[in-house]
Regions:
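Histone-fold recognition with a strong bias for associated Lys/Arg-rich disordered tails
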Residues: 1-181
Length: 181
């Protein structure tokens, strides 16, 4: 069985928090809000390109502010289950934010899909953007890749910061630790 990425866990934490203050039942609209709020993910990038933000989704959620315990509704459960199916279809080991976004728009009757439909966003819109991002090599990085990129950037900054280095023989920084010989 497929699990969920750390980003999806963040999405669900945000969705649960919002559901607590807006009626207690966690729905796709809360998950959609979480997708908007978790930055550097496929879903937030797609939604940002389409002009959908947490503020936009939040306006719909704020209409029903009744504090209570959070219970996930059946549409949200189906969305999470369907996200795992999409992850499997894309040969991904874990369901990620873009799989959840696809699952939300797949169910046209869900509250999240209805919010997006008002912006003329449907399953095909999301799928086309996702396929385009994948074809162009645009993919959110995992934490280890982010750390490696950070160290590469640091190496470049260190190398440029050495103006006396005429021979361009700066030693690379390996995993953030420079070896002394």
């Amino acid at each position: 069985m497929l699990g969920f990425t750390i980003d999806v866990q963040k999405v669900m934490e945000i969705a649960t928090s919002i559901a607590e203050i807006s009626g207690g039942t966690l729905g796709t609209e809360h998950i959609l809000f979480g997708l908007c709020e978790v930055k550097d993910s496929y879903a937030s990038e797609i939604l940002k390109r389409l002009g959908v933000t947490g503020d936009v989704v939040g306006k719909y959620i704020k209409k029903s502010l009744i504090p209570s315990l959070v219970v996930i509704n059946s549409a949200a459960k189906r969305t999470l289950e369907r996200a795992r199916v999409f992850a499997d279809k894309y040969s991904d080991d874990l369901a990620d934010t873009h799989h959840i976004l696809l699952a939300i728009v797949y169910d046209q009757n869900s509250a999240g899909a209805k919010i997006l439909a008002q912006y003329k966003i449907d399953f095909n819109t999301i799928k086309d953007i996702l396929d385009s991002m994948s074809a162009n090599g645009i993919k959110p990085q995992d934490p280890i890749a982010r750390i490696n990129e950070m160290f590469r950037n640091m190496e470049q900054m260190i190398f440029r910061a050495e103006p006396d280095n005429q021979e361009n023989t700066a030693e690379p920084v390996s995993a953030g630790i420079k070896k002394d010989n």
